[in-house]
Amino acid sequence: MRPSPGEVPTASQRQPELSDAALVSHSWAMAFATLISRITGFARIVLLAAILGAALASSFSVANQLPNLVAALVLEATFTAIFVPVLARAEQDDPDGGAAFVRRLVTLATTLLLGATTLSVLAAPLLVRLMLGTNPQVNEPLTTAFAYLLLPQVLVYGLSSVFMAILNTRNVFGPPAWAPVVNNVVAIATLAVYLAVPGELSVDPVRMGNAKLLVLGIGTTAGVFAQTAVLLVAIRREHISLRPLWGIDQRLKRFGAMAAAMVLYVLISQLGLVVGNRIASTAAASGPAIYNYTWLVLMLPFGMIGVTVLTVVMPRLSRNAAADDTPAVLADLSLATRLTMITLIPTVAFMTVGGPAIGSALFAYGNFGDVDAGYLGAAIALSAFTLIPYALVLLQLRVFYAREQPWTPITIIVVITGVKILGSLLAPHITGDPQLVAAYLGLANGLGFLAGTIVGYYILRRALRPDGGQLIGVGEARTVLVTVAASLLAGLLAHVADRLLGLSELTAHAGSVGSLLRLSVLALIMLPILAAVTLCARVPEARAALDAVRARIRSRRLKTGPQTQNVLDQSSRPGPVTYPERRRLAPPRGKSVVHEPIRRRPPEQVARAGRAKGPEVIDRPSENASFGAASGAELPRPVADELQLDAPAGRDPGPVSRPHPSDLQNGDLPADAARGPIAFDALREPDRESSAPPDDVQLVPGARIANGRYRLLIFHGGVPPLQFWQALDTALDRQVALTFVDPQGVLPDDVLQETLSRTLRLSRIDKPGVARVLDVVHTRAGGLVVAEWIRGGSLQEVADTSPSPVGAIRAMQSLAAAADAAHRAGVALSIDHPSRVRVSIDGDVVLAYPATMPDANPQDDIRGIGASLYALLVNRWPLPEAGVRSGLAPAERDTAGQPIEPADIDRDIPFQISAVAARSVQGDGGIRSASTLLNLMQQATAVADRTEVLGPIDEAPVSAAPRTSAPNSETYTRRRRNLLIGIGAGAAVLMVALLVLASVLSRIFGDVSGGLNKDELGLNAPTASTSAASSAPPGSVVKPTKVTVFSPDGGADNPGEADLAIDGNPATSWKTDIYTDPVPFPSFKNGVGLMLQLPQATVVGTVAIDVASTGTKVEIRSASTPTPATLEDTAVLTSATALRPGHNTISVEAAAPTSNLLVWISTLGTTDGKSQADISEITIYAAS
């Protein structure tokens, strides 16, 4: 057992939390390390079997099990369930951040392990006899010799568990993930040395001084020591003191009952292992090796499929079980059961049919001959079904432990071990072939887990008491039955084909190569049948998988096609498979719960819908965009699961206080300057025996909340008492929008409960104008609303691009339609702050952070929608803005105190659109409902579209000519000439239009996930001024003589391409490195810049910078030397200025001349969705 990185200490002394991109990078690194560990570990087992053969491998396998058995009994079994939570609590509560607790823990663990290691080495002959029985076929002296050399691993196995737990609580996951790889590499190297050492392994008699024996035993133990050494180095790098400190912490004593239960659980399970090994070793010399290798083969697909599924579901399942949220637990059980069954049942069918071929393909090498590989294959076929009950038992145990019922699993393990022992005792009497006994032992093991699953089901049903008396819903049962039927049909047909085609001859005559070919044929037979049956039965996971395959194929085709089509249409992307879930809010301090389910679309609809686009936001009229919303038709919703960080410029996760909106005018900051610790965890009953404070988590970028489920990425503002965050769902590897409700815990319970209840009702609104609510949680310090992440830009970012009026009002219709649907459902959207609103990449204005306060009403929504439209039109916010500033400037007001109409600010805004924005913002504007507002928006859009259509040019009156029967030659020639001129002009216009369209499409589809601008969102009409370069500021151009990359805190970014920023060619550019962290400055280094050396000392007037990135901020600095040592050696000429994609001009107020000008990137933006800045041209103008 290995500790889980589930809980992280939050005391001030703890290590800093990982940043958002660092988390993603570490997650991928851990996944890669796990894959390498499994590959090298299995290669090690195969090599060992091939070198030693089945009989000798049995001796080594039994001896190598002993250190794991002893370590599990002494320490490992209790460490994950007991020590890790206590360690996390110590780091939170202790003044020294848990340093003394860690020292006591390591001292106690080392003492116990040293004693256990010494005793186990001394008792090696007894332990071997316990495992082999009284009359084994396995070489007992050789096994004992190996045991003497391998049992010292007990010490390092136990310490590895301790060190992993300490590192995990410090957010250090790399070394624990790679340490097993080091162990496997050392073990493989040991096998190479074993082959190189001359002589033979002494078997009869066994000599402890035999070179090969010592190399194999000591080398294997050295690998485990190397694994622990890697962890110890990481411990020292974290400056964690391990100096001995004697004493037992009182917190450990409280967990004595649970520790006793865990030890008893492991002891009973190890009893079944001992009985199985004794019977296997008595039956045949190869028995233990086949018995153990069978289990290793079964764990390969389980580790890649079953563990992945369980890892996704178990964190939420544990939280809900700990919170005693029975409906949520039932929903999670149903989801986990469904995902487990649909992935493992086909795997079991394939392994059952192809078992003999699998054994030969994997192990028919060297001294592990074809006969032993065949028996191993038979064991795989007989015990493959074990995967399913094994996974279900793990699910059930997690629920019991989360509900603090450690003694209940004892009943399950007693049943499992009892059936397993009974079946193991019967195995030698079932078959007359001693070599097949190991296969029937695997069958007995599976029957034991099956019995445990059945007993666990009834115990869980009695404990949870589900409505209707069933833990699994009808939908889940149907999916399981369909999957079973499809797997049975596919397996039966594959077995018949295997017999009729004589595929077994491939294994018999071609060995492992023939077995691989045989498995390929079986897979080609089974896969189409499984796919056809599940797709015809409309299993949602199958349809989602089909969509994913289609998307992958299409993306590969598009990569080889023109650049203008290198991105899939959103409608072709597969959506996530979701399931209807029964949810309720956890009761706040004894209050009544809200029995409001979160409604989702049926899985079939979700799988069928995929990622459909909303109405496009363009300047041309669209009937679908206008009347679809009016009719209330259910529009497909975009799903934003891709990792795309949209950090608002200049936003800082500052404190949020709670003044009344009327008390703060637009742009005012709250007075509260400190945010206290905030606890976010599943609600549970207070501990009667402990008064320990709750787990406190500081709301800062990189912090983990909800037991590590969500990692905070970027703060997006807030309005009292709410905070808006972009976060990463680490379980599902997708981004989400988190709205923290009353994180400081000042609202009354009834107000908080009413807020969460109203927000829960928003989950029923299925409109593109409101982000889909995924979860609503009542925590110990407020509430948490989890919604889908809306890819695109904030309202302020999009307003800053000056979108066209027609595009703006068309984009607003999605939000108005969502408000209309919400008001009809009896709930308001609470559009009270510009930071709540985002513009999606599909051109929809969306309520991105749902959370409806009790005082919210439909009239406030109308004003909020009008204010959002007003902001898109003139880049001003017309309403009072409480909380954290959004970046929008306040609107100017007329003599009556009303915001000035947008048309008075910009004469190019159509009167109808301006009137809608102005009237909806005013309290007495006459717009009383969202449906009226939506209708006015559609009418204004239609009128604006008609006024933009050019009428025909009136021709001068021409006297009517007398009609003739046939045109004369002069008229015919003139008409022919005019026709040719018209065709030529039309062709020229068409060619220019096609070139412009290709350029626009290339920009849009070539950078969908990159920076935002008005053309990509379809919010701006093309104008001549947008493509023309800005007029040159006064003063002469100063051409730099040299440019170098200035990076005092790290390596220079692409120094060889620095000249491209001043070469006068906008098509070339200097790019920074691509950073994994979306905000690398100043966390990774303080920044990077370009040092431009001027031909002579010059008073700089303006600096023009052309960039392709979004969100980049630069400072203009001067230096006395071209190579200053630090950034402090330069002088700031202009403060940080946000750059827009395209041409930017920065005015420099410098009185003194300078010969060295530094363009310093203080904030890195994004280019094509990557954390990278791209500067194509820098032009310097002297002061006039």
UniProtKB/Swiss-Prot annotation:
The keyword Nucleotide-binding does not apply. The chain crosses the membrane at residues 42-62, 68-88, 108-128, 146-166, 177-197, 213-233, 255-275, 295-315, 344-364, 375-395, 410-430, 436-456, 477-497, 513-533, 980-1000. One of its GO terms (biological process) is lipid-linked peptidoglycan transport. It comes from the Bacteria. Residues 561-573 have a biased composition (Polar residues). One of its GO terms (cellular component) is plasma membrane. Residues 557-673 are annotated as: Disordered. Probably regulated via interaction with FhaA. The modification N-acetylmethionine is found at M1. The modification Phosphothreonine is found at T947. SUPFAM superfamilies: Protein kinase-like (PK-like) (SSF56112). It is found in: Cell membrane. Its main location: membrane. The keyword Phosphoprotein applies. Residues 1-41, 89-107, 167-176, 234-254, 316-343, 396-409, 457-476, 534-979 are cytoplasmic. GO terms for molecular function: lipid-linked peptidoglycan transporter activity. Residues 63-67, 129-145, 198-212, 276-294, 365-374, 431-435, 498-512, 1001-1184 are extracellular. The extendend C-terminal region contains a kinase-like region, which encodes a catalytically inactive pseudokinase, and an extracellular region reminiscent of carbohydrate-binding proteins. Essential for cell growth and peptidoglycan synthesis. In the N-terminal section; belongs to the MurJ/MviN family. This is Probable peptidoglycan biosynthesis protein MviN. It comes from Mycobacterium tuberculosis (strain ATCC 25618 / H37Rv). The gene is mviN.
